[in-house]
Amino acid sequence: LPQQVDHKTCKSNNMDTAIIEVRNLTLDDYNALKESMQKAYASLGGQYWKEETLKRLIQKFPDGQIVITHNGDVVGCALSIIVDYDKFGDKHTYLDITGNFSFDTHDPDGDTLYGIEVFVHPDYRGLRLARRLYDSRKLLCERMNLRMIIAGGRIPKYDMYANELTPRQYIDKVRNREILDPTLTFQLSNDFQVKKIMRNYLPEDNESRGHATLLVWHNVYYDSEKSIILRKKDIIRIGLVQWQMRPYFKP
């Protein structure tokens, strides 16, 4: 795979210089990915993707599955499919969009990159790793000439305010920086807009009370006249993007 190296300075969680890489997911990454996901979703009972599910997703759309590594260890990922958004519109659930994890909803001729997963191991948060995953997803959207990125976003702090605020009021307060929501605040800072509040998107997500934000990022380079056939002929590999992170410590 082609390699690009860009040297960055930011926080590191150890004394050594850290090498951060973004690349496509392979099945060889499964055990490390499972461990990171269980840590990331400890508050949801340590949920994780089954190996056969990830295998099916990679077979459907290998270019849309991205991992980030810290000194060679897989510590996060961003998973996506392509959909024809008009078929789903603004009212759908997570199971609707994933075809109950069959991913039969993936449409290579679709116009929208739909983000179905993104997480970073909690021990590696604060290193801007999630931002790099999002940037890689945006780059993929641009290279594939897709109209936009759509995702259903959790609002994990909403449960703390649910007795006093409606989901809309909560989102407005997060947008106005009166409340810090670790997921929504980050997404808004990465140029995503809240298009709608979706109820019962993930009913088992008690922290969000089953709600999700329908998030959208528009590809300003989208060309509606570009041939889908030409898009299919393009080589759209994330490749290997590497950063060297020098440690930064606060007393």
Predicted features along the sequence, with ranges:
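Cationic, low-complexity basic patches in intrinsically disordered or flexible, solvent-exposed regions
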Residues: 4
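Hydrophobic structural segments
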Residues: 229-251
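C-terminal/domain-terminus segments
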Residues: 16, 21-26, 50, 133-140, ...
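Hydrophobic adenine-recognition pocket in adenosine-nucleotide-binding enzymes
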Residues: 25, 118-120
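Conserved acyl-donor/pantetheine-binding loop and adjacent beta-alpha core of acyl/acetyltransferases
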Residues: 78-117, 132-135, 154-182, 188, ...
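Short amphipathic alpha-helix that is part of the acyltransferase structural core
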Residues: 13-89
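Conserved acetyl-CoA-binding loop-helix of GNAT-fold acetyltransferases
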Residues: 120, 126-142, 148-151
